[in-house]
Amino acid sequence: MTSLDDPFRKARETDGVLRCPFQGDEIPMILRHEEVRRAAKDWHTFSSDAPFRVPIPSEEQLRSVRQLPIELDPPDHTDYRRLVEPFFLRAKQPAFVARIDRIVARLLDEALARDTIEIVEGFALPLQSRALTVLLDVPESEADIWIGWGVHVFHGNDGLTKARQLEDYLNDCFDRAEASPGDDFFSLLTKASFRGRPLDRAEMLGFANLAFAGGRDTIIHSIACAIGHLASTPADFAFLRADPDRIIHAAEEFFRVFMPLTHIGRVCPVATEVDGVAVEPGGRVSLGWASANLDGTVFDEPLAIRLDRRPNPHVSFGFGAHLCLGAAHSRTVMKSLLNALCRRVERIDLVSQRDRVEKTAAYDRTLGYDQLTVRMAPPTA
């Protein structure tokens, strides 16, 4: 991935929407930053209360439960989110950060001991999986199971098989938590109450399904793309190493430009119009996160990766009520990785790469890497 692309620029600047055929429907993707944020807050017009239809393509064939709380609108969304939000915000606590730092250090030890390392499956996937054990407060050994699922839980030719494996695994986790509750994420849900009643198993699965499927691609993709950029742009790596205080803004810029989720769906309860495109009741639109992040009316030189960019009002973690529950965790992992690279690596050399491209009827978008191999050199004495 040698340069950024923007397949939405022309439509964003002229029409404001891109008509995208998916699964027999033509879904208008909202492209402009201001309009995406406005729609994300307007749940009366653009509703998330649509099980399986918020992701695009939809996931009726991949899971049996509504993902919580993302596939709901306020006030239900608000009340469900309140049950788990404190658990996810632990990612800001020093003890949590220290555990992530130790995982990063161990994986970096292994990377530096090798001549070369493949980043996507050989580094980013293990880091994401082991960091998730910290977030869910389960034994790190569980990560070995998750790593075995591969990079994309719900994608590829075996997506349905993987989805069933995930649901079977989650049911086993809840069975164990109910039999012997602890302080982990699964036990939290078995003990939680929603409006005076215990959660049922479908609700528990809805939370857990999102925790596994929602953030997996995002973190793996962001890690790989950040390392790929530092390998292909040594000046930017030197810029960070010269002053680690720059890492906070650099992390946000990486999240802005390396957005793995192109868009997300909303269902219109009533007839509406989106930049001249009529949408019937029950029809879908999508919020173009990736396009909004490249809107030149908001971001100066949007295709330039500026590690000191500020302000940086990207929408990579969503906007409004549905702001990503895992945002703090993603930021902690990214900052921990960048800090460790700056301290312990002098140079990252690109050895080989194979770009990952999202191909659709309406656009082709480079998403990062299917494979990325680099050589990391420690500082010379």
Each model region followed by its residue ranges:
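Cytochrome P450
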Residues: 1-381
